[in-house]
């Protein structure tokens, strides 16, 4: 991954790099890989995340349609 540093503004370049890493999901991946996760735990976590996403989408749909 590459970030341009303009006018020796390192703080702005670091901010841009952090935003790119966040968008790519690198921090989340690092957090998940910090410890071994059993396959059964992984399936349970992914199922719970799917349920959470479905509920969130349903809430947004209801809010948008006004039901």
Curated annotation (Swiss-Prot):
Keywords in alphabetical order: Ribonucleoprotein, Ribosomal protein
GO BP terms, alphabetized: translation
InterPro entries: Ribosomal_bS21, Ribosomal_bS21_CS, Ribosomal_bS21_sf
Entry keyword tRNA processing: no
GO molecular function, one term: structural constituent of ribosome
Stored Pfam families: Ribosomal_S21
Superkingdom of the source species: Bacteria
Disulfide bonds: none
The keyword Ribosomal protein appears for this protein: yes
Family annotation (Gene3D superfamilies): Ribosomal protein S8
One Gene Ontology term, aspect cellular component: ribonucleoprotein complex
NCBIfam families: S21p (TIGR00030)
Record family assignment: Belongs to the bacterial ribosomal protein bS21 family.
Full protein name: Small ribosomal subunit protein bS21
Organism lineage string: Bacteria, Pseudomonadati, Pseudomonadota, Alphaproteobacteria, Acetobacterales
GN (gene name): rpsU
């Amino acid at each position: 991954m590459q970030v341009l540093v303009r006018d020796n503004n390192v703080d702005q370049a670091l901010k841009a790099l952090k935003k790119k890493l966040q968008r790519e999901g690198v921090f989340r991946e690092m957090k998940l890989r910090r410890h071994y996760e059993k396959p059964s735990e992984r399936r349970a976590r992914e199922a719970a995340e799917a349920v959470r996403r479905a509920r969130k989408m349903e809430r947004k749909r209801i809010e948008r349609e006004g039901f």
